[in-house]
From Swiss-Prot:
Annotated EC: 2.4.2.9
Name by which UniProt lists this protein: Uracil phosphoribosyltransferase
Pathway annotation from the record: Pyrimidine metabolism; UMP biosynthesis via salvage pathway; UMP from uracil: step 1/1
Gene3D superfamilies to which the protein is assigned, alphabetical: 3.40.50.2020
Keyword match Magnesium: yes
Originating gene: upp
Amino acid sequence: MKVVEVKHPLVRHKIGLMREGDISTKRFRELAAEVGSLLTYEATADFETETVTIEGWNGPVEVDQIKGKKVTVVPILRAGLGMMDGVLEHIPSARISVVGIYRDEETLEPVPYFEKLASDMNERIALVVDPMLATGGSMIATVDLLKKRGCTSIKALVLVAAPEGIKALEAAHPDIELYTAAIDRCLNEKGYILPGLGDAGDKIFGTK
């Protein structure tokens, strides 16, 4: 599995701000979208382009445009919604495919409860967004679902990843790509990333 830890100074700075314990909901939400935008920039760097001729202000001009498969952004509910606008900032025409999965706090296992995917998943590149890759369970379950629906090109975008989650995701889906703003130290006994960001969903939505 291709794993890219984006070490751009802006990304490192913004993730550092998100680690503040008393950060406001508004600020955390803004930063989640901003880092999601920067991760999208990295994740789409290998998109192919083609030269087309358009009518410019002074006659015909050749320009580059993205070609190939169309994109669908796949936020994992609920926290993934906080990164979605950052993706759409760069790819406003992307279809939105939604997957609902929550983690059982006792077993730490993923529990699917909702899905609404683009009808032509086999023709699309899926950019799956979820702030935290902890145990990897939710991301693995989401990729399982996307593959069952025919999607063969999948990139996962997360704010923070734990080594345990990366290892589990790679074992389950070695053919996808992972882009993360930070790889943190480890998981605690409750499956939370250390040092992490806390509960990203609670911080994005302001509710527990």
